[in-house]
Amino acid sequence: MKKFLAILLLAGCVSGVEAQNNANEKTLFEEVTGLKKKSDKFNFFLNMNGSFDAMDNQAGKSGKFNMRQLRIEAKGQVNDWLSYRWRQRLNRSNAQGNNIDNMPTSIDIAGIGVKLSDKWSMFAGKQCANYGGVEFDLNPIEIYEYSDMIENMSNFMTGVNFAYDATPNHQFNFQVLNSLNGTFTETYGDVPVEMTKLPLVYTLNWCGNFNNVFKTRWSASIMNQAKDKNMTYIALGNELSLGKFGMFLDFMYSKEDIDRKRIMTSMLGGGASLPSAEYMSIVT
């Protein structure tokens, strides 16, 4: 299917907390809870990305309006050490099905953040995998079409992330997440392997900033796919800014004992995932 026309309809964020015109007049929230409402405690966002898609394929020519992204998000800072974040897609099914974390895939993020010290913090709950790459870190409403590797990855899973701020410009993360959303069969098909007892993915991440000229977002991950079957994923995101000139270069490599992304499996007719696959991608 070839898409040759796309029009960005709307991409924006709407803040859900506004000050009263009269500072002496209490809001409904204050009347009910007795608490003074502050913008850092609750913020609401609406993220939208739409297009008009014109297609020319074997079925003929056609066109339609398409709402690519429609997400609502609430996040806030409860106090100086506790925060929360929730983001959900309105154009994805809310059925939780057989999801191992008991949450529907429409929920991208749902968890709490805790500041453990001046340098250490953690986030527990459903969250985005801390993979490297500049493209991977962009807001989805800013993306028209992801590269094939990112488009076919599972990016939102449940677990915990620990962050260490070595300096104001360098942060290191260690993250442990479920490696599945649904069941093993839903993810890989009928593959003749023994399931692992700990379907987890472990990620080390480094976010660096060198005088706002060169920035890094690098990661290394290992995923338990099945017993004695693993996936190794390396992502090196690099961003360069020189005055009015800017560019980024992402390098991604994935070695999978079971074809997790299923790109090669789909090219060969679908069905159960191939017993092994390797992918490499460069995006700039």
Labelled PLM ranges:
Residues 75-80, 152-159, 247-254, 269:
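Short C-terminal domain-edge/linker segments immediately following a structured domain
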Residues 1-29:
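Cleavable N-terminal export/targeting peptides
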Residues 50-56, 69-71, 80, 88-94, ...:
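Transmembrane beta-strands of outer-membrane beta-barrel pores
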Residues 61-68, 103-108, 154-158, 196-202, ...:
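Residues that define the transmembrane beta-barrel architecture of outer-membrane proteins
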Residues 49-58, 95-103, 120-207, 218:
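Surface-exposed coil loops of outer-membrane beta-barrel proteins
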Residues 199, 204-284:
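Detector for outer-membrane/organellar transmembrane beta-barrel domains
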Residues 19-122, 162-172, 239-241:
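Beta-barrel outer-membrane channel/assembly domains of diderm bacteria
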